[in-house]
Amino acid sequence: MYTMTDQKQWKGRIDSTTNRSSFRLHQQVKRIAMNDVSASDKKGAAIIGFICDEGVRRNQGRVGAANGPNALREGLSSLPWTFEEEQQIIDVGNIICLNHALEEAQRELGDVVSTLLQKKLQCVVLGGGHETLYGHYLGVRAAIPKDAKIGIIKIDAHIDLRPYDEQPSSGTMFRQILEQDPHVDYFVVGIQRYGYTKELFEKADELQVKYVIEDDMTSAANIQPLMDDLQHYMDQHDYVLLTLCMDVLNAAAAPGVSAPSPFGLEPTTVRTILQKVTSHPHTHSFDICEVNPSLDENGRTVKLGAYFVYEALNNLLGGQGL
């Protein structure tokens, strides 16, 4: 179900009502219904929320990520508006998963993402469980030529290649995509070595998934080769889709997730990867998933997630912000 965002989600500190240099995001982000979205000459980005954690429930995880989109909006609200006057950010609302109808909600999200991309807007999806990604992918695939090569880059502790014979979940979507679309490749960074059975790593090799284990990313010497690999991967694809699962981070930095990672990545490492990918000219959309406010401590997962979203918006809009 599609709904508009409540105005109360965009509120915060006001330092000035006239000096643009003192504005914050809640003073500039415009709420616009999907029916009223039009293509613009302005360089623009659109935010869409996916209020759903049905995939997490099906995957036997801890629910609560459905509250992530509005929590992230609140985290973004008081961040400084540093974009150029000709740039715009709009909030087009939410897709809500009702009555456990995950597949229907994913199709609805895909329709929104496709429309936004076809209107030449950069797209940021606020999840939701990581089942958010499948709807994001559906929208990208519908917006570009059928034979265009999509390169998915996922920053995540998990491979998400579980079987979907019985039903899809937050752990199946990449297997769904790779088995259904011959024009997609999949590159995962941050995988937890102790988080998966040998069978799932074997499935990753069978599907020719590129992946980097978390403990191969612990030193600065390892990061530059990864940046080089990402650059080559992005250059080889027509469209790059970036998805971030917050459980990739060390649990001390991001406790508010369904499956926290004791050996997770440091925020600065994730930021470096995010900057690299969202600055590439083939990247036009980004999603952030698994922010669970009910499991958070002092709001630090939400705040970190909001900073990552801001970083993505800044780079997708051409790096005009701070």
Curated annotation (Swiss-Prot):
Enzyme type, top EC level: hydrolase
GO biological process, any: L-histidine catabolic process to glutamate and formate
Cofactor binding annotation: Binds 2 manganese ions per subunit.
Listed pathway(s): Amino-acid degradation; L-histidine degradation into L-glutamate; L-glutamate from N-formimidoyl-L-glutamate (hydrolase route): step 1/1
CC cofactor: Mn(2+)
Known EC number: 3.5.3.8
Amino-acid positions noted as binding Mn(2+) 2 in the UniProt annotation, renumbered to this chain: 156, 158, 245, 247
GO molecular function annotations of the record: agmatinase activity; formimidoylglutamase activity; manganese ion binding
Manganese found in the keyword field: yes
InterPro entries documented for this protein: HutG, Ureohydrolase, Ureohydrolase_dom_sf
PROSITE patterns for the chain: ARGINASE_2 (PS51409)
Binding site for Mn(2+) 1: 130, 156, 160, 245
UniProt cross-references to SUPFAM superfamilies, sorted A to Z: Arginase/deacetylase
CDD domains reported for this sequence: Formimidoylglutamase (cd09988)
Keywords: Histidine metabolism, Hydrolase, Manganese, Metal-binding
Catalytic activities: N-formimidoyl-L-glutamate + H2O = formamide + L-glutamate
Stated family: Belongs to the arginase family.
Protein task: Catalyzes the conversion of N-formimidoyl-L-glutamate to L-glutamate and formamide.
Stated name of the protein: Formimidoylglutamase
